[in-house]
Amino acid sequence: MKLEMSSYLHKVPNTGITNLSNSKSIVFIMFCATLLFIITSSRYLTGSESLGQIPSEIPKSSEQLNEELSQQINSKLHKLASFDKFNSFPLLNKHMKDDIYGLMTLETFTDPLPYLENYNEEEYSQQNYPICSEKLMFPSKIKLTKQQYLPADLQQFLGVLNNMRPYHDMVEKAKAYFISDLREEKKWFRFAGSSIWLPQFQCHYMVSRYLYSPNGVANHAFASFLYIQLFDSDWKELPSHTTLDIPFEQTEANSIFKIFKPKQKYANFRNSTYPQILPIPFDYKLPIETKKYYYGPEDPRILLRSNPLGFDEPLIVFNMKGLKLTKRVMYSYLPFSNTLKLLKKRREPFANIEKNWTPFKSVAQPSKTQTTIHFIYSMIPLEVLACDIDSGLCDILQKPAKHDFNYVGGLRGGTQLVSLPLNETIPSEIRAKLPIPKNRQVYIGWARTHLNNCGCGDSMYRPNFITLVEDYDDVTDKYYYKIGDISGYFDFAAKIEPWSKQVLDEEGNLYEKAEQCQGRNVLIPNSIAYWDVGSIKLAGTEYQKHDFKDMFSSGKVSDFNANEIVFNDYMGVTLSSADRDVSIVHVKGLLNYILQLPSLVDDSLVINKEWTFQKKGHDLNVRCAMIASKEYCKSYAIKQGVKIDEKSEET
């Protein structure tokens, strides 16, 4: 069975022409055949059964917008784009006070290239590489807050779900099939909250995954749904029925005489009410022999995309199982415009499972960032893609040698990657002093490593800080990528809930059992919700963001050295533990640490040749991080009272 998104199939218009010429008759016949094909094969992306979430305000226009309406839309677009960048900040002052931040050690392992001339495979193959601690480790203290939980009202979610008839009917069928005495609230799990800051609307836009599990076990999902909430700069959810006037892409309708022409797109506006469930269509079947259902969108990640029509909009990527494809694949979705695209490599088949693609927006070529989205397809070994947003087709920018086409390493997924917050609000005089090599871009994120049998339960998941370095060779017009720095496990001092499962007692009663280091032990980083500079210190004087605009023109600042620059930057990282919650931790001063990393600022480490990726030992920093992660796992298990088995672990 197919759950369908809202669609509008237009009838053939009455042209008033009774005697068509042969050429027009051919065009008309071809149009009818095309329309018949669309209708009969629309089980995947279109259909008459609406999910009821995206309202009819998204029309397909058969004519160009009239001049008056165009002026109104352009006025709205101008107003959105002209918000005060110097007085917009994603965090209230109370979340920026020093006394709420504690210190935690972050240890990253940097680029090993300078140490590979005398590379000794035997020496470096030891379990505890001396090079890790002696040469590659770069430790520092970073500031972070206690985690803040970001809840959702289950009854409110169910109210929205019940108004979307296909979703509601599917869940009711599942309830009738999976007989269970569990209370309804025990069957629903919300986690994987991924968020971005919408400065034009002064709110945080969060997508999270609501999972329905009839037996109350998080990793026995029947179906998942994507839920949108809005939060203010205090990270309080905005009231129910909050409405935004959002921009979207309006597409012209089919026309007899424009069948083979690209459809024209226009910017328009509509009202959108929150919270809401995204109307993602998906296949489902009940029952199936394997009893492995897992229908619907999973693991959403989000970033902000600059639409060529002149507005910024969220772009969500997720993986989803399809009955037609008989496998899990990746999709992109534009919620403002209700546009869903399957993502696929242009000249390669699907792998057995497509998931954990790490999205980022390349800032090297701003004109292309409007139409493409980049991904780390694989971290070990490193493979990078660029995908066209309109078609979903992906080109390989950097492809490593892989012995197994379907290989997926332990390091994968995590948050999206973001560029350093050195945007146009930072004075150009300051940016010019920073020691980043020419034609280099730096992206950072929090990946996560999946370790099996490392000491705590069956498997452990924790965040790992990473930097992705992008070097451009203007002679060959080619981009090169590398993992510049990577940390071992870093848990943000967050509370990690034990994995929960339903078990029977001696009398046959079902109860919930949750113990640390039993089953999975999970803390997943889901998004960098924001990253911005609140103030800058120069030679001991602090300048707030609203001062950046005229710091130098007003004569407040004279000459200065790069080592006199101190950024007070703030980053929000959203987390989920045990597939059952959403929280956020605020991090302060990370930018200063990053700007000291040798892999980012050393000109001798600029990549401009393929051989760099073929030198033995080029991935030593990643290996060091994996060793450190395993040591964390053992240490964590010991603290939980687990007796460590010294058998070899597998990743």
UniProtKB/Swiss-Prot annotation:
GO MF, one annotated term: mannosyltransferase activity
Q: Which residues lie on this side of the membrane: Extracellular?
A: 43-651
Q: Which InterPro entries match?
A: BMT1
Q: What class of enzyme is it?
A: transferase
Primary residence: membrane
Q: Which family does it belong to?
A: Belongs to the BMT family.
State the name under which the record lists this protein: Beta-mannosyltransferase 7
Q: Where are the Cytoplasmic topological domains?
A: 1-19
Q: Where in the cell is it found?
A: Membrane
Would you list which residues are glycosylated? N271, N423
Alphabetically ordered keywords of this record: Cell wall biogenesis/degradation, Glycoprotein, Glycosyltransferase, Membrane, Signal-anchor, Transferase, Transmembrane, Transmembrane helix
Q: Give a Gene Ontology cellular component term annotated to this protein.
A: membrane
Name the Pfam families on file: BMT (PF12141)
| Membrane-spanning segments | 20-42
The protein's role, per its UniProt record: Beta-mannosyltransferase involved in cell wall biosynthesis through beta-1,2-mannosylation of cell wall phosphopeptidomannan.
| EC number(s) per entry | 2.4.1.-
| Protein topology in the membrane | Single-pass type II membrane protein
Q: Name one GO biological process term.
A: cell wall organization
- Gene behind the chain: BMT7
